[in-house]
């Protein structure tokens, strides 16, 4: 038996897990695991033909249990997501090695468990991405859920509580998928993709609706789609730094992967489009699009309220997921490309942002946006990385986030969906405002006296951050590189493929060439620089000396406050923050609590014989009548 | 060799009556006699299982051919559960030596003999006798723990079980009055003409409620939380793990062979759904490990009843897989609960104190909520695919309830896991943290190892379960085995 490339990849990943498990307590274990991730990435790159539309690579691993065939294989879709997974795993793990690891262990963290959880997450994600039928998809799905639980819970305390909330949501989602699986099986008699594809054609509308709700809801839980989003931000934010970079980059995209595979590829956007909601003008597809849009808006504005940098970023992670789904649901060449490209772009800048914030925590010990400020001179490289990251997150040129968002907007306009477009723009507005809060409160404004001696983050942390920053810029300049992979993914899932060039897209309804855009932008910067430097000498003063503008104030006087940022805006939109989703969640829990009390009362009653006899009488009466 | 089957019941029975006397003569000899008998029983059954041709066979006791004489019926299903009874009897053997040990060991032998009899009996009256014997042995064993709570729980159980027995007897009387026979194979022949009427239904329902007391059927299961919380963990494990399944097996046999009314299945389905809802929800607020496990056991048995209600024995495979899975998991969990009694909040920090036990708890919980690729997932998968294939809306409701209950189950099980893995509170001395250890941990480890082995060997295990289920589903095979076409050829 010869090993296929996919076998090699999975074995490699399994070996990484074993290394983390058995020698993960030793010296330099982190570096060893990181190198192994690099090896996995190389194996994946050997399969690069997949990313350019090169067929399927199957795994030799397949077996039959209770009449069900289980198989695993990689295609362009899996390859694209696996690339992001392994890339973010490699860089997050690299980031964790060395300085961060030592300080984490010093604070009482279990670094062995951390590396183990990371390796487990990567392996389970690869298994999920390789799934060749719906049953292996479900197996992979559950593995990813529980592996994620381990990574989220390992910090203990608040993190464990957040992880508990996550796993309850994830179980609910998982069971919805499980139910959907059973329904699919009952009509197709098999869970193989081709059999399901045929069965979908003859399915009744009711059943299709039910399946769209079950699968959409189930997969949506992991994506953090409204109204199942409450778990995500605390769970990701409280994970130890590099872990949240990894989770924020890729974890919830597994939901999008599954949606692409099941709802888009198997059920088909056309079929979903034909599901009308009675007595209204909208259909299931519009419903998904509007859910996506609300997922953009609400979490983004919630992010603006956060005072913890990690929570702020995690809330954005939910909102950005909305853009991806929106693009995919619009489903024309540009929209699909935008949604899929955003998966890649989001992973790059989200990981960079989480890392930058973790670097700040590493040096200052806090992520509280009200207790930081002025670090730009102390940590200039981290500032640069964060700046590049937030430009990407806000979707502004010249970074990669602009390209994907532009594609999504363009497709909304092309397809005549102005309301959705407007809503998406409102979301972007919120993003820009809140990322400004992020960079301002950490790096700009007044430096705190206690941070005067803060140094730049160590190189073990800086290197992966700089690599990510470079990727963000380069894929912003040449979006054609990832767009090539995206186009093959579109073909695989049955969406129209986009017509891409190195600098962007070619289309009759509007082209984009980032090389030109960035060229013009940098020409502008150049002119600005010429004016700045020709204006004469500037005088350098100590940072703590330059706030007072001539007044005699010592540095320990706070005269620039970052507290209660956007007070005016919050006053304006405050009425919308009623916490209705929290209320919904609480009422479900109270309901279960109440029912549980009733049931316990039922079992606590002493007159058990009465139950027995009355049941007997009741059934007898039922028989006689 | 087939004749030796009767020994698996007779020897433990004999042992049970002789043990108190033998213990007086020689303690050293008396201590080993019980395990020796059970080990021999395991060997007989294991031998039958391995060397037999996998064809069912019937053993007529006392030389009278059925339906006049009584017979033991051994297909792979019955053998499997008989083997489980002997093996679990051995595993949960009350090794502790004190002045009560003779009585406790004798009762345990009695319980195993009765359980084996329940698995193997081929006629209704013997089933009833063994059923009563199980009840008597259980009362004795629960009360043996000696606390006043245990006595109170036993009394409640005794009364409930007594009324249940009367109902069972009433059902049997109805059947006998109608058909004049109690042999299951004979009944299977006569049933389509004589029992597919209201009388038959009434008989079945009184049997269902009567036997349901032991099978933790809602709403006659109110004894469960008290008894499991007060009896010794080993006994709770045996009761929740095995005895409830055997009671279930009787109902399943009756349903398959004798009562084909759709109403019968419907009642089981409704009661099963109510069992799942009540059990899992009650477990959500349970403040103590064993009580939580007891409620969860009620819920799991409810799931089994839902599976059993599938028409024409379609749920056979699901029932079998779920029952065996629950047997392993609950036994293991009760063993862990042995060292982890008391309020759940007390368990903070016990993962650091006993990491293996905590790991096993997580493993069992994961399998119980059905995480693939653990066996629990496959058991649940067989159930939901069958349920989703039904057109009757009540089955789909069963499916929905089952899935929702799993979410609740995961929430409360992992809440406990989170407590276990929390760091211990500062003010507590290390010796105050409950530790799971010794024999119970070893036993739980055994079940854990079995679970992992099954995970790895899931494909062959699945195939074997499918053949067992197919054989048990075959009504004609049952009749032909007990009444061979050419008389006298069976022995």
Locations of regions flagged by a protein language model:
Chain B
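Transmembrane helix-loop-helix hairpins at membrane boundaries of multipass inner-membrane proteins
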Residues: 1-7, 11-98, 102-106, 185-189, ...
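Alpha-helical transmembrane segments and their helix-start/interface "positive-inside/aromatic belt" motifs
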Residues: 26-38, 152-162, 354-358, 438-444
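Hydrophobic alpha-helical membrane-insertion segments
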Residues: 33-49, 162-170, 361-369, 446-460
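Alpha-helical transmembrane segments
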Residues: 34-41, 86, 109-111, 205-207, ...
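Helix-to-loop transition at the C-terminal end of transmembrane segments
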Residues: 48-57, 176, 180, 458-463
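Hydrophobic transmembrane alpha-helices and their helix-loop junctions in integral membrane proteins
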Residues: 91-102, 112-125, 139-381, 385-411, ...
């Amino acid at each position: 038996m010869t090993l296929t490339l996919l076998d090699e990849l999975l074995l490699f990943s399994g070996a990484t897990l074993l290394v983390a498990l058995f020698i993960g307590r030793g010296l330099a274990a982190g570096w060893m695991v990181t190198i192994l991730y690099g090896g996995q990435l190389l194996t994946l790159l050997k399969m690069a033909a997949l990313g350019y539309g090169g067929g399927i690579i199957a795994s030799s691993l397949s077996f039959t249990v209770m009449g069900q065939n289980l198989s695993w294989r990689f295609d362009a879709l899996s390859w694209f997501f696996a690339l992001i997974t392994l890339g973010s795993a490699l860089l997050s793990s690299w980031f964790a090695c060395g300085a961060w690891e030592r300080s984490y262990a010093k604070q009482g963290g279990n670094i062995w468990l951390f590396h183990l959880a990371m390796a487990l997450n990567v392996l389970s994600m690869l298994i999920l991405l390789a799934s060749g039928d719906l049953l292996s998809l479900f197996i992979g799905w559950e593995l990813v859920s529980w592996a994620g639980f381990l990574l989220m819970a390992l910090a203990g305390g608040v993190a464990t509580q957040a992880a508990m909330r996550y796993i309850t949501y994830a179980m609910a989602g998982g069971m919805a998928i499980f139910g959907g699986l059973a329904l699919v099986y009952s009509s197709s008699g098999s869970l193989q993709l081709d059999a399901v594809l045929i069965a979908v054609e003859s399915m009744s509308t009711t059943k299709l609706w039910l399946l769209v709700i079950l699968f959409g809801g189930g997969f949506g839980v992991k994506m953090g789609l409204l109204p199942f989003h409450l778990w995500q931000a605390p769970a990701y934010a409280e994970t130890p730094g590099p872990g949240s970079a990894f989770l924020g980059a890729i974890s919830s995209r597994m939901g999008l992967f599954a949606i692409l595979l099941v709802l888009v590829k198997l059920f088909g956007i056309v079929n979903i489009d034909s599901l009308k909601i009675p007595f209204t003008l909208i259909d299931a597809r519009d419903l998904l699009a509007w859910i996506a849009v609300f997922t953009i808006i609400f979490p983004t504005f919630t992010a603006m309220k956060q005072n913890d940098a990690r929570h702020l970023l995690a809330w954005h992670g939910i909102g950005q997921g909305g853009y991806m789904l929106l693009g995919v649901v619009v489903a024309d060449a540009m929209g699909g490309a935008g949604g899929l490209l955003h998966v890649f772009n989001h992973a790059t800048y989200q990981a960079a942002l989480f890392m930058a914030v973790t670097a700040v925590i590493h040096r200052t010990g806090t992520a509280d946006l009200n207790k930081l400020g002025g670090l730009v001179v102390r940590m200039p490289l981290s500032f640069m990385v964060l700046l590049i990251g937030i430009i990407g997150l806000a979707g502004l040129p010249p970074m990669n986030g602009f390209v994907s968002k532009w594609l999504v907007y363009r497709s909304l306009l092309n397809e005549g969906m102005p309301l959705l477009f407007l809503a998406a723009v409102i979301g972007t507005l919120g993003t820009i405002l809140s990322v400004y809060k992020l960079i301002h409160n950490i790096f700009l404004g007044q430096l705190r006296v206690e941070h005067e001696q803060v140094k730049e983050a160590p190189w073990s942390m800086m290197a992966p951050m700089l690599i990510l920053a470079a990727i963000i810029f380069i894929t912003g300049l040449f979006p054609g590189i990832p767009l090539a992979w995206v186009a093959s993914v579109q073909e695989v899932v049955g969406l129209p493929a986009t017509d891409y060039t190195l600098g962007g897209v070619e289309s009759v309804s509007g082209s984009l060439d980032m090389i030109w855009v960035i060229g013009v932008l940098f020409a502008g910067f150049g002119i600005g620089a010429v004016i700045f430097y020709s204006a004469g000498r500037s005088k350098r003063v100590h940072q703590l000396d330059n706030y007072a503008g001539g007044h005699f104030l010592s540095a320990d006087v706070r005269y620039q406050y970052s507290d209660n940022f956007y007070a005016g805006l919050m006053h304006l939109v405050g009425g919308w923050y009623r916490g209705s989703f929290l209320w919904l969640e609480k009422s479900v829990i109270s309901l279960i609590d109440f029912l549980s009390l009733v049931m316990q009362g039922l079992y606590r009653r002493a007159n058990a014989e009465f139950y027995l006899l009355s049941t007997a009488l009741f059934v007898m009466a039922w028989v006689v009548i | 060799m087939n004749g030796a089957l009767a020994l698996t019941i007779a020897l433990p029975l004999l042992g049970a009556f002789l043990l108190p006397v033998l213990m007086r003569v020689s303690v050293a000899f008396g201590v080993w006699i019980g395990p020796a008998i059970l080990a021999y029983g395991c060997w007989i059954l294991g031998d039958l299982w391995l060397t037999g041709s996998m064809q069912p066979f019937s053993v007529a006791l006392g030389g009278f051919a059925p339906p006049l004489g009584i017979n033991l019926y051994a297909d792979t299903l019955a053998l499997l559960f008989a083997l489980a009874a002997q093996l679990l009897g051995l595993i949960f053997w009350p090794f502790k030596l004190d002045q009560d040990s003779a009585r406790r060991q004798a009762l345990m032998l009695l319980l195993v003999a009765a359980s084996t009899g329940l698995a193997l009996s081929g006629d209704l009256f013997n089933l009833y006798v063994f059923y009563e014997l199980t009840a008597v042995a259980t009362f004795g064993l629960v009360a043996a723990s000696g606390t006043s709570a245990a006595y109170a729980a036993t009394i409640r159980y005794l009364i409930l079980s007594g009324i249940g027995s009367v109902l069972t007897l009433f059902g049997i009387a109805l059947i006998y009055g109608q058909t004049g026979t109690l042999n299951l194979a004979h009944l299977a022949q006569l049933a389509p003409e004589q029992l597919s009427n209201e009388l038959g239904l009434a008989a079945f329902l009184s049997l269902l409620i009567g036997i349901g007391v032991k099978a933790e059927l809602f709403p006659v299961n109110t004894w469960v939380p008290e008894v499991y919380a007060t009896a010794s963990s080993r006994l709770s494990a045996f009761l929740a793990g095995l005895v409830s399944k055997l009671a279930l097996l009787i109902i399943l046999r009756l349903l398959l062979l004798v009562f084909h009314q759709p109403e019968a299945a419907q009642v089981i389905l409704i009661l099963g759904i109510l069992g799942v809802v009540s059990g899992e929800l009650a477990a959500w607020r349970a403040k103590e490990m064993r009580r939580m496990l007891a409620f969860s056991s009620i819920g799991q048995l409810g799931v089994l009843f839902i599976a059993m209600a599938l028409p024409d024995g379609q749920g056979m495979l699901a029932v079998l897989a779920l029952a065996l899975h629950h047997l392993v998991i609950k036994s293991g969990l009760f063993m862990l609960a042995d060292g982890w009694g008391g309020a759940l909040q007390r368990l903070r920090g016990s993962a650091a104190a006993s990491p293996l036990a905590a790991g096993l708890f997580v493993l069992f919980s994961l399998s119980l909520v059905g995480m693939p690729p653990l066996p629990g997932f496959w058991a649940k998968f067989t159930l939901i695919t069958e349920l989703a294939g039904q057109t009757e809306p009540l089955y789909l409701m069963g499916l929905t309830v089952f899935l929702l209950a799993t979410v609740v189950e995961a929430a409360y099980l992992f809440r406990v896991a989170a407590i276990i893995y929390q760091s211990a509170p500062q003010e507590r001395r290390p010796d105050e943290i409950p530790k799971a250890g010794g024999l119970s941990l070893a036993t739980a480890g055994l079940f854990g190892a079995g679970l992992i082995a099954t995970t790895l060997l899931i494909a062959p295990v699945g195939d074997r379960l499918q053949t067992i289920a197919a054989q048990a589903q075959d009504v004609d095979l049952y009749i032909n085995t007990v009444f061979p076409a050419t008389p006298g050829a069976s022995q």
